[in-house]
């Protein structure tokens, strides 16, 4: 695997000329059009734009989670400063190699906490599994770490939440469990795709404060996706504005 030079020593993610399209009934729709940007260690970058502007498709491309077909990455590179592989283009990695990066080096929090957790497993077991797989912890070590994470994300009565099924806790608590899961392996990059949209305003503010605190404490880079400039302004150092699949504006907050 050839070594790749990133544009800056602090750069941990470099997206270059990314083009993604969807093919449906023979018709091609371009969702991401020649997008390029860098993410630096520990910084918070907001990606803002209206629905359909390509924000989530860009995020899913970074995670290599787009289903093909109908999605197709036409061109571009996504370079990651990986703990395991060195500087690598994630689009060239096998599914097996990607499994060691997802959750471990790049983690993602999705918009809808109600559907992000598996309803048939207890909340604690869902976090615990990630620790056993990626951090090679014993069951006891993973449980203790999970309870510690639940405390860190300010879940009340961590032991009770650990043994609860997702339907037994509130939407805000579900999202805190998802944040604990995402942060469990101390990833270099956390992608949050509209993580507060499904929550009420008070819970939304608490989740934003929590994520900002975790980012600073863990020195994790945050990519925060939203259609709401007010929310982005709360957490981002820098903003990328997307429109019709392109980055049309970029600036500091």
PLM feature segments, named:
Residues 77-100, 138, 209:
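ABC ATPase NBD Q-loop/coupling interface
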Residues 79, 141-160:
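Conserved ABC ATPase "signature" region
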Residues 184-188:
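A short, proline-enriched helix->beta-strand linker immediately N-terminal to the Walker B motif
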Residues 205-219:
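Helical segment within the ABC ATPase nucleotide-binding domain
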Residues 232-234:
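A short, surface-exposed alpha-helical micro-motif characterized by mixed small hydrophobic
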Residues 250-251:
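ABC ATPase "signature
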